[in-house]
């Protein structure tokens, strides 16, 4: 298995409902390390840039509005098979279809307020990490 980095966002709904610690604990319990983390309020321009690949899709405007509705926590996670492991921990994108015990099943109820975002590939992880974190802010421990 490869040791790799992945990108995660704890979304406004989970931040508002004080689930940050519980979500980070899930990552750490599964063996992922948080090697960079920051809380911020996304601007519309930041959200539009981050989700540019979805521009023109039916959910894009709602997603941008939601992601700018409150603070988010952006993170870089590190560990064995980090991308796949994080996606497994998150569960299905639609919380109503997420398996019991996954982050989305336990901490969210609807779309797009589904608690977390995670990279879906090594290419996405590299792009998403670079969007929010300069290289010197990502410290492997």
Swiss-Prot record:
Transmembrane segments: none annotated. It catalyses: a 2'-deoxyribonucleoside 5'-diphosphate + ATP = a 2'-deoxyribonucleoside 5'-triphosphate + ADP; a ribonucleoside 5'-diphosphate + ATP = a ribonucleoside 5'-triphosphate + ADP. Keywords: ATP-binding, Cytoplasm, Kinase, Magnesium, Metal-binding, Nucleotide metabolism, Nucleotide-binding, Phosphoprotein, Transferase. Its cofactor is Mg(2+). It comes from the Bacteria. It is an enzyme of class 2 (transferase). GO terms for cellular component: cytoplasm. One of its GO terms (molecular function) is nucleoside diphosphate kinase activity. It holds the Pfam family NDK. NCBIfam families: PRK00668.1. Homotetramer. Major role in the synthesis of nucleoside triphosphates other than ATP. The ATP gamma phosphate is transferred to the NDP beta phosphate via a ping-pong mechanism, using a phosphorylated active-site intermediate. Belongs to the NDK family. This is Nucleoside diphosphate kinase. It comes from Cellvibrio japonicus (strain Ueda107) (Pseudomonas fluorescens subsp. cellulosa).
């Amino acid at each position: 298995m490869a040791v790799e980095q992945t990108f995660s966002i704890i979304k406004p709904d989970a931040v508002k409902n004080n689930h940050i610690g519980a979500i980070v604990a899930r990552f750490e319990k599964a063996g992922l390390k948080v090697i960079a983390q920051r809380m911020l309020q996304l601007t519309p321009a930041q959200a539009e840039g981050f989700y540019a690949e979805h521009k023109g899709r039916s959910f894009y405007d709602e997603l941008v509005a939601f992601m700018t509705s409150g603070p988010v926590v952006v993170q870089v996670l590190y560990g064995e098979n980090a991308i796949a492991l994080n996606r497994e921990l998150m569960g299905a994108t639609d919380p109503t279809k997420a398996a019991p015990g996954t982050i989305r099943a336990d901490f969210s109820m609807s779309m797009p307020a589904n608690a977390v975002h995670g990279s879906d590939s090594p290419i996405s992880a590299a792009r998403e990490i670079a969007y929010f974190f300069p290289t010197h802010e990502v410290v492997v421990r």
